[in-house]
A protein has these predicted regions:
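Short, low-complexity disordered leader/linker segments with a strong preference
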Residues: 1, 21-23
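Bacterial N-terminal signal peptides that target proteins for export
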Residues: 1-9
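Intrinsic structural disorder/low-complexity segments
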Residues: 5-6, 62-64, 165-168
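Extended rod-forming repeat segments used as scaffolds/tethers
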Residues: 9-10, 176
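C-terminal motif of bacterial Sec signal peptides marking the signal peptidase cleavage site
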Residues: 16-19
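Sequence context surrounding c-type heme c attachment/ligation sites in exported
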Residues: 23-32, 36-50, 57, 75, ...
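His/Cys-centered metal/cofactor-coordination and adjacent catalytic loops
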Residues: 47-71
Length: 195
């Protein structure tokens, strides 16, 4: 099923990239939590945010978003076909157990621990086993560093963490994403608008 879902999503994204409107594209098959494959080329996608510092968890995170989702403006919801991938790195530690930092105070990335993916498709939220944890039409996947082997993480925990941010389309760091785009001069949204 994972392969079928990946092929259906890829076909939809190719059609959108080729200029077909999303309305004219056949919708991708419904995907359940744990079935959404990590696209092989995701590190070539626009960066959502990089070097997200999580000293509380001893982690550094890089987040990517596919071109379908990267063009929205502030206050807009991500369209169906959006996929976001998060690389979760262990922060390096000094011999005394403290977290290693760069001269500018940022945590230093160590080994890649896991890869998480979230994708949005029409009706995908209807597949959620616990309706009280529905995050719109988003589904989630959690994989080991190879981005193929399921990590065994409880997807309900992902859903529970994203649930309180419905006003941001269930996407953490939504506002930070737009602030970063404006600050770096990358704020070119559909229709040419800026926040």
């Amino acid at each position: 099923m994972q392969h079928v879902a990946a092929v259906a999503i890829a076909a939809t994204l190719v059609a959108v990239a080729a200029g077909c409107s999303p309305a004219s594209v056949k919708p991708a098959a419904k995907v359940r939590d744990g079935e959404l494959a990590v696209p092989a080329d995701y590190r070539s996608w626009p960066k959502f945010l990089v070097d997200v510092q999580r000293p509380d968890a001893k982690q550094v995170r890089d987040i990517y978003i596919n071109p379908v989702g990267s063009g929205i403006g502030p206050g807009e919801m991500f369209p169906n076909g959006t996929i976001s991938v998060m690389d979760l790195y262990k922060a390096k530690e000094n011999p005394d157990g403290t977290l290693m930092k760069t001269p500018d105070g940022k945590l230093v990335k160590g080994d890649l621990l896991k890869v998480f993916v979230m994708g949005k498709g029409a009706g995908w939220g209807d597949t959620v086993a616990k309706p009280e944890l529905k995050n719109g039409d988003w589904v989630y996947g959690a994989y080991k560093a190879d981005a193929r082997t399921p990590s065994g993480d409880d997807i309900a925990a992902c859903r529970g963490c994203h649930l309180p941010i419905a006003s941001k389309d269930f996407v953490h760091r939504y506002d930070e994403y737009f602030q970063t785009r404006v600050a770096t001069g990358a704020a070119k949204f559909k229709g040419g608008g800026e926040p």
